[in-house]
Amino acid sequence: MQASQPETWHGTTILTVRKGGKVVIGGDGQVSIGQTVIKSNAKKVRKLGKGDVIGGFAGATADAFTLFERLESKLEQYPGQLTRAAVELAKDWRTDRYLRRLEAMMLVADKDVSLVLTGTGDVLEPESGVMAIGSGGNYALAAARALIDSDKDAETIVRSALDIAADICVYTNRNLTIEALAAS
């Protein structure tokens, strides 16, 4: 008899679009374990710091909240410097024994920059102002890139692209949380 492996938590889709003086991050609300939807209205996108940074996460929820707290601490150390705060968090994430075990990715943005942060220490800025993470991330990214040159605004692109991702990815739903900031 074989010991069964614990079911793994799946899914989410987080997307950011920077266009027309706005930056928007949106995410779906589905949390699944194995083939079962555990929750359909999770809030994976929120404002950080003093409300001048927005972020979304994919991965283990408790891990992501730990990382959000650490990022907020770095933002207090380096106010108005999202890139510096993100790099400092990434250094800690790679070198701290506890943080290294955290399984999450984050998209964060302020008025000037959008970044993706990974547990391998990557801090990446998208070339086109569009970036996505999570199980439906590639679908949302492709849809957003297809729409970026249209007359649609950033929030409409995020909503449309996440709807398309929800049509394709079984770990993504249409219960969206959207946050936006004025961008430079």
From Swiss-Prot:
Query: Catalysed reaction per UniProt?
Result: ATP-dependent cleavage of peptide bonds with broad specificity
Task: Tell me which UniProt keywords the record has, alphabetically.
Answer: Allosteric enzyme, Cytoplasm, Hydrolase, Metal-binding, Protease, Sodium, Threonine protease
Q: How is its activity regulated?
A: Allosterically activated by HslU binding.
Q: Where in the cell is it found?
A: Cytoplasm
> Which amino acids does the record list as binding Na(+)?
166, 169, 172
Report the CDD domains cross-referenced here: protease_HslV
List the molecular function annotations (GO) for this entry.
Answer: metal ion binding; threonine-type endopeptidase activity
Active site positions? 12
> What enzyme category does the UniProt record give?
hydrolase
Per the record, the domain of life is Bacteria
Q: Which GO terms describe its biological process?
A: proteolysis involved in protein catabolic process
One cellular-component annotation, GO: HslUV protease complex
Listed InterPro entries: ATP-dep_Prtase_HsIV_su (IPR022281), Ntn_hydrolases_N (IPR029055), Proteasome_sua/b (IPR001353), Proteasome_suB-type (IPR023333)
Chief subcellular location: cytoplasm
E.C. number: 3.4.25.2
**Is Iron among the key words of this record?**
no
Q: State the Pfam families in the record.
A: Proteasome (PF00227)
What the protein does comes down to: Protease subunit of a proteasome-like degradation complex believed to be a general protein degrading machinery.
The record's subunit annotation is:
A double ring-shaped homohexamer of HslV is capped on each side by a ring-shaped HslU homohexamer. The assembly of the HslU/HslV complex is dependent on binding of ATP.
**UniProt cross-references to NCBIfam families, sorted A to Z:** ATP_dep_HslV, PRK05456.1
- Tell me the protein family, please: Belongs to the peptidase T1B family. HslV subfamily.
Its protein name is ATP-dependent protease subunit HslV
Give the organism's phylogenetic lineage: Bacteria, Pseudomonadati, Pseudomonadota, Alphaproteobacteria, Hyphomicrobiales
**Chain's gene name:** hslV
